[in-house]
């Protein structure tokens, strides 16, 4: 079997294992087994369930980490798909299935590429190449990758997210900010007896909307966006 066909079948096998966030064990075991078959020097599953494989060169040098996540967004509308979301079917040169581009295709390609590079060079390269298959990215991005970074201690990182084959040199980063306003509950017929937390939150939101995000000459303008508002416990508090 040639390398391309072997990679295609590897990707299809990964797609056929559903792996919503928190349920990545099956595909993690597949990644571990494939790395071992490909001759990675060390393959471990960390305390969060992410897989880390190491391929060492013959000479000392720096460490590069190729990273991707193996969880996928859950499927709640399978009946609306034109192909089985977990079938890994090929149609007109494309593989269809949940997680194909985000990002089982990339992860399987990176594992295969490292293995073939080691084989073609006879491992005559400096340093170490690591491949990580992280979990919980779709719902809790950053936590599992922090553990991988601690274990691999890379000098350079390449993240295999889909970019239409264009190289992206960085990203703007992300921060999630939680703002709370407190009120005093009362019956709506006697609003003067309480404090409406929602009104306080409205004032906070208006102030936030006046903030102008920073702009970077390469990364562009920053984004500041309200993503959620909750009253909990209702109606005593509002959380954004």
Residue spans for each PLM region:
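Acidic/histidine-rich catalytic neighborhood of metal-dependent amide-processing enzymes
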Residues: 103-172, 176, 234
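N-terminal helical capping/dimerization or prosegment-like subdomains
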Residues: 1-65, 69-75
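Metal-dependent peptidase/peptidase-like ectodomains
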Residues: 166-200
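A structural signal for short hydrophobic beta-strand segments in well-ordered beta-sheet cores
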Residues: 43, 53, 88-90, 226-229
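Acidic-enriched catalytic cores of C-N bond-cleaving enzymes acting on peptides and small amides
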Residues: 191-240
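Active-site metal-coordination/substrate-binding segment of hydrolases
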Residues: 62-130
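Short glycine/serine- and small hydrophobic-enriched flexible loop segments
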Residues: 13, 112-119, 203-209
């Amino acid at each position: 079997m040639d390398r391309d066909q072997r990679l295609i079948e590897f990707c299809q096998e990964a797609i056929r294992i559903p792996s919503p966030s928190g349920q990545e064990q099956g595909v993690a075991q597949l990644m571990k087994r494939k790395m071992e078959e490909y001759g990675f020097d060390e393959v471990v599953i960390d305390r969060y369930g992410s897989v880390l494989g190491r391929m060492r060169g013959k000479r000392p040098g720096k460490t590069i980490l190729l990273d991707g996540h193996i969880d996928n967004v859950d499927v709640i509308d399978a009946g609306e798909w034109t192909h089985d979301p977990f079938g890994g079917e090929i149609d007109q040169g494309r593989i269809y299935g949940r997680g194909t581009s985000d990002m089982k295709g990339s992860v399987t390609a990176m594992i295969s590429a490292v293995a073939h590079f080691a084989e073609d060079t006879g491992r005559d390269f400096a340093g170490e190449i690591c491949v990580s298959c992280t979990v919980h990215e779709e719902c809790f991005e950053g936590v599992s990758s922090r553990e991988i970074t601690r274990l691999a201690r890379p000098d350079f990182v390449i993240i295999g997210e889909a970019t239409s084959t264009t190289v992206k040199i960085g990203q703007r980063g992300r921060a999630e900010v939680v703002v709370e306003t407190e009120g005093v509950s009362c019956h709506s017929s006697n609003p003067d007896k309480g404090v409406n937390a929602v009104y306080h939150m409205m004032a906070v939101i208006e102030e936030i909307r006046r903030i102008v995000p920073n702009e970077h000459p390469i990364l562009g303008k920053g984004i500041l966006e309200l993503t959620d508002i909750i009253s909990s416990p209702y109606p005593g508090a509002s959380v954004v």
